Amino acid sequence: MTLSNLRFQTLPADAVERIFAVFDERGSRHYGENVSELEHALQTAEFARQFGESDAVIVACLLHDFGHMLHDLGEDAALQGVDAKHEELGAELLRGLFPEEILDPIRQHVAAKRYLCWKQPQYAAGLSESSRRSLALQGGPMTDAEADAFQLRPHFAACVSLRRYDDMGKVPQMQTADLRSYEPLIRRFLVH
């Protein structure tokens, strides 16, 4: 997996501008859904805002699929039978920029899908085709032991909430605020 096509060496020095540059360059890509990466990010954040989530959850929702834009595996790696581990890739690149209350839900939103499939077997039936396909690559529903451990995570509730908004944020042509409107909120959580 290579990040070279993003031309990181030419990205702005400012962390938020780097994030926006990645969205500008790769946000129009699709990942097996009927919305682009950018549309999905904005919708997921919008649903979190509508449901009264904390600002940290809103930022996590906005950035949760950042890792999808960082790999060069194509727009839907799951179709090729590949788990891109986008949740780990995104959280790793954002590490050092944001606190754990944002990074952990990003890192764990795939685990939250697996957890919800364990907790509510009917949940899997409501997943999009792309999410069901990737679920198989990501390990399927959690085991009892995995679920017990997952429920003890310090940001467990935020992880599950993000996952639910992630599932909702796939509405073609939904109107949302633009990416730049989140700049003050993102900057507020930067650790540098």
Where are the regions that the model predicts?
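Acidic/His-rich, divalent-metal-binding segments that scaffold phosphate/diphosphate chemistry
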Residues: M1-D83
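Metal-dependent nucleotide-binding catalytic modules
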Residues: M1-L3, E17, R132-H192
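Residues that form generic nucleotide/phosphate-binding pockets
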Residues: I19-V22, R26, L93, P105, ...
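Divalent metal-dependent catalytic cores for phosphoryl transfer on phosphate-bearing substrates
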Residues: F47-R164
